[in-house]
Regions:
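Active-site clefts of carbohydrate-active enzymes
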Residues: 88-92, 126-138, 227-249
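Glycan-processing catalytic domains of CAZymes
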Residues: 2, 6-10, 103, 154, ...
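Hydrophobic faces of well-ordered beta-strands that scaffold small-molecule active sites
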Residues: 12-14, 120, 165-167, 190, ...
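Loop/helix patches that line or flank the sugar-binding groove of alpha-linked glycan CAZymes
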Residues: 153-159, 171, 180-181, 197, ...
Length: 396
């Protein structure tokens, strides 16, 4: 598969989970069933019952970042012990205070690079250290997280100097994200803050000054990373309600959101199905349905692991087959935006600057390289809008 992708000029980014493993992992099984003798016990954070008060197991250090969510778990077959698992009992956290874990995970990344993958989406990148409310935002934790990602990057660059790394740093406060991009740690992070803002802008039909805020963030991250930071834009992902559902089925609003993030700087990530308006609301199985290739429930290569109930409630219109020949479809809206992005250098690689039309119903900005500038203006409303363009403000 890798050879075929590379032959077509496609780079392959693999999802790599380094914060935790599955509870069926041989390391964890050995550690939790033989906690006194296992060489893997220190690969995890496992405590004896004598080290904590089971009757008062609700103090601040037992709360996850999201509030009253327990991070300590118990294994049914090993009473008298508990282990750290921020994402639940089935996903025990690895212990990065143990240098052996660093070595193991760097080896894992290098293994896949040697197989030919071009980079990694780094799952739960902010949770390597600091899963407690009372420590997660301290300078010490920020420094430890940054140091690990610098170490990891260095290890990956030994195999592939051009490796692409993007971190899942789910943090709305951009100041708290700075350590992750500082001095060559993670040069790419998913922009969760921007994603939420773009959905709000599209749905409310008001720009809310988001371009000015975005430029400030780019300046901040650019300075911290010595100019190496690249944004990674998206609308929703596999852990969130799908864009079309967030928009309550309003196709115009969903198209507006696409028009915004596909004309902004950065590496764009499209969650499959978004390009045809696939709906989906939590729980997870409803936002991870099969790709709707066909109008019917049958077709070559179509998985049947889960009936696409959101898809088929729309009569098959939410499919590639139904939309591919419709010039006004969501699919062709995405295709047109992506063709612009590929053909117009300023849209693909250019910087961004605010262009204020004075109309809150218009989102406008300049994309520019040294030899090209493009004015992007998106009408957020359902009505015709007239704006005046001043040549001296367009960097042209």
């Amino acid at each position: 598969m890798l050879d075929e992708a590379h032959a077509h000029g496609i780079k392959v980014i693999m999802d790599l989970v380094v914060n935790h493993c599955g509870s069926g992992n041989p390391w964890f099984q050995d550690a939790i069933t033989n906690p006194e003798t296992s060489p893997y016990r220190d690969y995890f954070k496992i405590e004896k019952s004598t080290d904590y008060d089971e009757d008062k197991d609700n103090n601040a250090t037992d709360d996850a970042h999201s509030g009253n969510k327990r991070v300590w778990q118990r294994w049914w077959a090993t009473p008298g012990y508990r282990y750290l698992g921020l994402f639940g009992g089935g996903m025990p956290d690895l212990n990065y205070d143990n240098p052996a874990v660093h070595e193991e995970m760097i080896n894992a990344g290098q293994f896949w690079l040697e197989k030919g993958v071009d980079g990694f989406r780094l799952d739960a990148a902010r949770h390597i250290y600091g899963d407690y409310l009372d420590t997660m935002y301290t300078p010490e934790i920020a420094d430890k997280n940054a140091a690990w990602w610098k170490e990891f990057r260095a290890g990956m660059e030994e195999v592939n100097p051009d490796v692409f790394l993007v971190g899942e740093v789910w943090e709305p406060n951009t100041d708290r994200m700075v350590p992750f991009v500082q001095d060559g740690a993670l040069q790419n992070t998913f922009d969760f803050s921007l994603a939420s803002e773009l959905l709000e802008v599209a749905q409310s039909e008001h720009n809310g000054g988001f371009v000015s805020e975005l430029c400030e963030v780019f300046d901040k991250f650019g300075f911290a990373s010595n100019g190496k930071f690249e944004d990674c834009t998206f609308l929703t992902n596999h852990d969130q309600n799908r864009t079309m559902s967030v928009m309550e089925g309003n196709e115009d609003h969903a198209k507006t959101a696409a028009s915004l993030y596909l004309t902004l700087p950065g590496n764009t990530f499209i969650y499959y199905g978004e390009e045809v308006g696939l709906q989906g609301m939590k729980p997870d199985q409803n936002i991870r349905e099969p790709m709707p290739w066909y109008e019917s429930n049958e077709g070559e290569g179509l998985t049947d692991w889960l009936n696409g109930k959101n898809k088929y409630s729309l009569g098959g219109e939410t499919s590639v087959e139904a939309q591919v020949d419709d010039p006004d479809s969501m699919l062709n809206h995405y295709k047109e935006l992506l063709s612009w992005r590929n053909e117009i250098r300023a849209l693909k690689d250019g910087d961004v600057a605010e262009y204020d039309t004075g109309n809150d119903g218009v989102a406008s900005y300049i994309r520019m390289t040294q030899d090209q500038s493009v004015l992007v203006a998106t009408n957020l409303t359902g009505e015709a809008v007239t704006v005046e363009v001043e040549a001296d403000k367009t960097f042209g």
